[in-house]
Amino acid sequence: MNIAIRNPVPVRREEGSLQVGLDPNDRIETAKVFAVYGKGGIGKSTTSSNLSVAFSKLGKRVLQIGCDPKHDSTFTLTKRLAPTVIDALEAVNFHSEELRAEDFVVEGYNGVKCVEAGGPPAGTGCGGYVVGQTVKLLKEHHLLEDTDVVVFDVLGDVVCGGFASPLQHADRALIVTANDFDSIFAMNRIVAAIHTKSKNYGVRLGGVIANRSAKTDEIDRFNAAVGLRRLAHFPDLDVVRRSRLKKSTLFEMEPTPELKAVTDEYMQLAETLWAGADPCEAVPMKDRDLFEFLGFD
């Protein structure tokens, strides 16, 4: 079968926006699927990669899919920038039947399988369509049949129909946020996007992961107001910065008491998600209401 990267056909209208439709044959039915969202630069790739390792240490077979054209989601797992699905397809002139799994799947730390979807050239095409074709390619190669957990690491806080496409595959959406105005403002917009998607797909909000924050008071106040819950809290430690520079996950860094507390938190998060976190029925605030709600400390 040939996979051609072309502009998607808008097949569904939801609240006035055109969305990229999901072929029922492309649903991921053999694994628990999590989509990780959050403000750009908040640490989604760090969170996703360490969460993937935690799942693997529970004995689960894990696949992490990076959905950013920068293709830097998985480098702490693989120790290199993995080739993207788009790169692999271009190399065979988009004749996907000529690809082998090793052309676009890299095994990382502790057996976590890593895929970087990549994206079309800047200013062209639809990144969400690329994500859909990545899932289709994985199914063609039967790579999802031996997978227990799929983690989508999604570009920034983009919630257009295209980059919301991982929500079509996900069971639970997780939002990474810091304890500040900009991160929570972005989180509210993501909640709105997930609220919209949940009307037509099975995705539900799983909860919030507090990251790079000494405190969580503003996060917790917002969660209580809209119907979210905090699943985990990761403080802003220098070991996180150093792990990125060493191209390593936190589980590979020199152990210290504070680092053990963080890796234990990741293990607890993985256990909670695997056990089946109840969905959050959150209702987003209007932008102006949120503006008045936050801050003033």
From Swiss-Prot:
Residues engaged in binding [4Fe-4S] cluster: 126, 160
Note describing how the cofactor binds: Binds 1 [4Fe-4S] cluster per dimer.
Annotated positions binding Mg(2+): 45
Entry-linked Pfam families: Fer4_NifH
Catalytic activity field: chlorophyllide a + oxidized 2[4Fe-4S]-[ferredoxin] + 2 ADP + 2 phosphate = protochlorophyllide a + reduced 2[4Fe-4S]-[ferredoxin] + 2 ATP + 2 H2O
Alphabetized UniProt keyword annotations: 4Fe-4S, ATP-binding, Bacteriochlorophyll biosynthesis, Chlorophyll biosynthesis, Iron, Iron-sulfur, Magnesium, Metal-binding, Nucleotide-binding, Oxidoreductase, Photosynthesis
EC numbers: 1.3.7.7
Associated pathway: Porphyrin-containing compound metabolism; bacteriochlorophyll biosynthesis (light-independent)
Coiled coil segments of this chain: none
Molecular function as annotated in GO: 4 iron, 4 sulfur cluster binding; ATP binding; metal ion binding; oxidoreductase activity, acting on iron-sulfur proteins as donors; oxidoreductase activity, acting on the CH-CH group of donors, iron-sulfur protein as acceptor
BP term (GO), one: photosynthesis, dark reaction
Co-factor requirement: [4Fe-4S] cluster
InterPro entries tied to this protein: NifH/chlL_CS, NifH/frxC, P-loop_NTPase, Protochlorophyllide_ATP-bd
Positions contributing to ATP binding: 41-46, 70, 211-212, 235-237
Family listed: Belongs to the NifH/BchL/ChlL family.
Subunit structure: Homodimer. Protochlorophyllide reductase is composed of three subunits; BchL, BchN and BchB.
PANTHER family linked: LIGHT-INDEPENDENT PROTOCHLOROPHYLLIDE REDUCTASE IRON-SULFUR ATP-BINDING PROTEIN
UniProt function note: Component of the dark-operative protochlorophyllide reductase (DPOR) that uses Mg-ATP and reduced ferredoxin to reduce ring D of protochlorophyllide (Pchlide) to form chlorophyllide a (Chlide). This reaction is light-independent. The L component serves as a unique electron donor to the NB-component of the complex, and binds Mg-ATP.
Protein name: Light-independent protochlorophyllide reductase iron-sulfur ATP-binding protein
Gene that produces this protein: bchL
